[in-house]
């Protein structure tokens, strides 16, 4: 086992704080409408330019192992916020840095780290309650567009496109972002269905970079039961091979010999194939398979209908223009089903929704309805260069995630104002334990950090902006960094999804609390390079051997 280097107490916290500061300082320059770009070197090709906090955070790796541990724990804040809310990563990083800095000072002054953490947690719970109370539901398409515009760094065209896509496919519909071959950024609405089952084997993957299986102009075989052998299917498989088209198999399960045979055929290139489990369970699974059959214009191979696998012909298979499968989801685009059949099925599901008395059943029926009727919206991002397209795509994805979050939990005034206004709720909390109270005060101060940073990135003194906002009675009064003016944030359309603000604070306080309570750090000592082998000499004198 390699020797370890161990740091304790103040030394450990100082090194960790240096790492936190390096990562946070690189990320926080991107915050707000006047945030700056960060240029990231790539091992090959042109450097990447981004204003996306989590993209910057993921690229940072420090030489000093202890500093790097601090940086990586802060990176976790950005990643977690991105996974849960899809946006707000820079805000989360700024909040975490503010809490860690003040927390480290308090610990250095002799306060109990565990009591500080209790105070931090108490204050954060009060802020979250306050944000939930202030959140207003998103009522109109215009509000959706405003949320999208703010998250896309003030790009109104992106906000409008996302609102348009959500209007077409519904809030529950599927919206994907792709790169466009042309200069234009456009929205394309495609009929399609997405369900939460991924490929059964990674060997089905066709795009190694994205780890997805993409099949074009594909046949779809739907089977109600498990497939453990392929003998009965050989006639239909041969017909598919002769047609030269790929095949998607959706069944209760594909196991053992059947899966192995499909994988071998896929790797040898004989049959472009992918297999996924059927979505849902029990009767619901059968209903969803029937939905897919209607969408693709195929037939469900079911014992109830007296159908056997050996009797299946290629005409019984469904068809789709494209199928995309990743580790967790399958999306069927442009199924070949008849419009009249799909509409009849939609009508049938709507009737079931009206009749059902169970909330759970109603929710599941509505999910099926969204899948059948919703379709898929594709936002194709264009630009003059590859660098521009990638940067714009980052912003579109952020904006899309933010609008989804806004629809889920509502909106609050943007520009860090919601957190600043929550100071009132935290200020009402008192605790007899001075160390717990110090933890509450740490959060009280940290709530100012996002507004300060947005102002500083716009070249304005942060303290002045914070003071001016807090002087005003209006809850929606704030600083518009774009115009460098004080405005009613909601009226101006500067709004944040409540979910993004909540998640940013929760994740920031969670990781910051761990950093503040850290008392020792352990890292591997660098291995010394082994000495080089000595150069080999000759074989010495061979005399005395009697020759």
From Swiss-Prot:
What subcellular compartments does it reside in?
A: Cytoplasm
Mind telling me which GO cellular component terms the entry cites? cytoplasm
Enzyme's top EC category: isomerase
**Catalyses which reaction?**
ATP + H2O + a folded polypeptide = ADP + phosphate + an unfolded polypeptide
* Alphabetized Pfam families for the sequence: Cpn60_TCP1
* E.C. designation(s): 5.6.1.7
Which Gene Ontology molecular-function terms are recorded?
ATP binding; ATP-dependent protein folding chaperone; isomerase activity; unfolded protein binding
Alphabetized UniProt keyword annotations: ATP-binding, Chaperone, Cytoplasm, Isomerase, Nucleotide-binding
State the coiled-coil residue ranges. none
Q: Nucleotide-binding: is it a keyword of this entry?
A: yes
Record-linked HAMAP family: CH60 (MF_00600)
- What family does the entry list? Belongs to the chaperonin (HSP60) family.
Q: Could you give the subunit structure recorded for this chain? A: Forms a cylinder of 14 subunits composed of two heptameric rings stacked back-to-back. Interacts with the co-chaperonin GroES.
- What is the protein's given name? Chaperonin GroEL 1
Q: Which gene encodes it?
A: groEL1
